[in-house]
Amino acid sequence: MKFYSFRYGPFVGLCNALLIILLSGASTLRADPKTIVAFGDSLTQGYGLPADAGFVPQMGAWLAAQGASVRVVNAGVSGDTTAGGLARLDWTLAEPAELVIVNLGSNDMLRGLDPNLVYTNLKQIMDKLETKNMATLLIGHLGPLNYGAEYKADYDGAFEKLAASYDTVFYPFFFKTLMAADGVTPNLQLYFQDDGMHPNAAGVQAVVSDMGPYVLRALQQ
């Protein structure tokens, strides 16, 4: 009977080399950054701040510090309303994204626009994002009392109603960490620019630190 010797050493070496290549490729795929589109107005755009101090760069840096591989795109337009956001949504999201942070409505409120219009426009935005299978983080805003209690209730409720209607992560109030101890009065001296409306770099940092965990949760949707 004739016996054959199977020389498996070179074969094993080849398999190991192939395995290393495959694992390296898989690691590269896992390392590909997820795209987050920050879609909003001047609060998103970084009005009045140095290029590295706005919401988008600070959020990107915070997420990277938590070990998240992400690319945060600045789709903020100063002065934008919910109607303006709806009008530009399709071309803004021409490229796919894993998560869209929706931060619109504050300019509608400043202009005294009907809260029902705010709700309708944001609903259409959320519908489009849902159709595109994009995860969302919806940021809420609170109306002022000087427009009357009814306006405030309707405006505040628009965001709450949307949050309850969609599979979204809801951050209830963009400025919630920038308020004084009463939770109502803005802490102007520490966290706001001279206009009293837009956060300074320290204010953005406080917002990002508080909102960051919500973003991480939304990325898991």
Q: Where is each model-derived feature located?
A:
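Serine-esterase "nucleophile elbow" of acetyl-processing enzymes
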Residues: 29-78, 88-96
